[in-house]
Amino acid sequence: MELIITHMFQNVNIVFQYWSDMSKKIINITAKLDRFVLKNRMVIAALLAMQQTLPLLAICVYAQLISQLILSPNALFVTLFNWRLRIPATFQLQEMLSLLEVFVLMILAATFTKQYLSIRKVTNTVLPTLTNFLGTYFLFLGKGQTPTYDTSQYLLVILLSFISCESFYFYQKFISRDNPQPFASRFLIWAGFVLLIDVSLHFAIQRSVVRSALSTLLSNNFFTTFIGLVTVSIVAPLLWWLGIGLPHELINNPSTINAVIKNLDTILTNTNATLPYPTNLYSVYTAFSLFGGVGSTLAISFILLFSVRKKRQHLGMLSLLPSLFNSNQLLYFGLPIFLRPLLLVPMIMTSLLGTLIGYTAIVTHLIKPATLSTPNTTPSSLIGFLGSNDSWSLLITTIIFALSVIIYRPFIAIETSEVSYEK
């Protein structure tokens, strides 16, 4: 018997050592790739621009948070406590918040332009900076319009600004060799051409065809299966990391998809009935893989609170409250997360971890799936409990969060020590 127990402990130790070595290799490879990416001019300019835009973004994020929790008609606290607040000009307030989101993107484009052209040793940056600032306005806003879609299109803004900067660099270098005034007619022609492209793209991105198609796709029964949920857990962090805006169903409460509605109808008809879709985006992905936003980044805010660098501690405190309510934009700009391989790997790992544990707990009947509707801004860490009234879900949530902290910790430790792009 003692030999059997000893042999078992030896096998466990071998497995543990194997996974430990594999983890170290993955972290080292990811860190090397991250350092390679941080040598790219466009990435350097983008990361610096995001960090410099962070104060304005913080104002925007907290204003939206107050609106979502208290001011809007379907705000979380208004719904939970049945408050009857009469707030004048609610619609105008929402419009102002939408405009503020676009203004953040405009500042991001202008700051990126100045940073990138400085790296390119271009001295006359006023016109291209102003052009990309106005171009972003024309890209997202039409005459008398406010955006009714997700404006978190960071990749689009950075790419268009990058192309504009490169065209200005070569235009100035090879066409305008006599170094005319910054607002010479030949440069104004270039600016007009860039703005014309932005206006043309505006009519393409405001079309709802793509967004409607994605919403319809996510309502497909495929995303109630194990493979479908795993696919979402990998693709969603990847797209968010790339700076591509995600459908509402992947960043907020997807209680309007067909599977959730059918489950709710079944429960309301007969509380003891078998659910047609016990595993779906709402009961698995949102409830267990979205803590703090895409990639379960609430763990990052928690880790940063204990960082040895004051700057990172401040970022952790600044981002903690929005992260509790599923908003990780401050982390996205503050670290930044954009195009950083070092942060993509743990984002996918934690997202997959939450999906695997949540899915397993539901199919083994360890917990009840979330079927009851919750307000849109409900913290994802509470959806499993509030949507099922099953206290065991809180235990699963705690386990997933603790494991997420363990996964993120070595990556954040390396990120904290990497300041090459800041230099």
What are the language-model segments listed below?
Residues 192-307, 316:
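Generic multipass alpha-helical transmembrane bundles of integral membrane proteins
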Residues 2, 12-15:
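Acidic, Ala/Val/Gly-enriched low-complexity intrinsically disordered segments
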Residues 125-135, 243, 254-256, 321, ...:
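Central hydrophobic cores of alpha-helical transmembrane segments
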Residues 254-266, 353-377:
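Juxtamembrane non-transmembrane "cap" segments at the membrane-aqueous interface
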Residues 119, 283-286, 300-368, 385-395:
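Hydrophobic alpha-helical bundle architecture
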Residues 15-69, 75-245, 369, 375-423:
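Signature of multi-pass transmembrane helix bundles
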Residues 5-6:
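Short terminal hydrophobic/aromatic SLiMs and anchors at protein ends
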Residues 23-32, 257-273, 312-332, 375:
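Juxtamembrane inter-helical linkers in multi-pass membrane proteins
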